[in-house]
Amino acid sequence: MSKVFIENISSDSKVKLSSLKKLAQEILKDFEEKGDLNIILVSDSFMRRLNQRFTSRKGTTDVLSFSFKEEKNAKAKGSLLGEVYISVNRARKQARDYQATFDQELKRLVAHGILHLLGYEHKTKKDLEKMRKKEEEYIG
């Protein structure tokens, strides 16, 4: 079974880590993924630096996923599947914009980040629709 580690290095102490961990474990189990996962909750300023360094994009973003699997479609074999970084500031703003709760938006971002690690992309409208549908299966 995959292990999920969650760390909140943002200044927001109102994050319910247990519900995020449970969701992540459910997704990994459904995909029969054996690799472990790190989820790191960060501030916008931290995310801005990550985004610039690893994607060469300026500004912040809501979620970044980094796969540690050797091959794109390979299953991690008891090793680290990857890391998902989530901007808590972005999650709060998007929750207001989407008329969702903060917890719902964090769960959506966790699902979104993990789905990227599992091979989902959203380069086309069709891909985005497929990914959104899968996210909804988990966050309802």
Where are these predicted regions, by residue range?
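An acidic/histidine-cluster motif and surrounding catalytic segment
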Residues: 1-107, 117-140
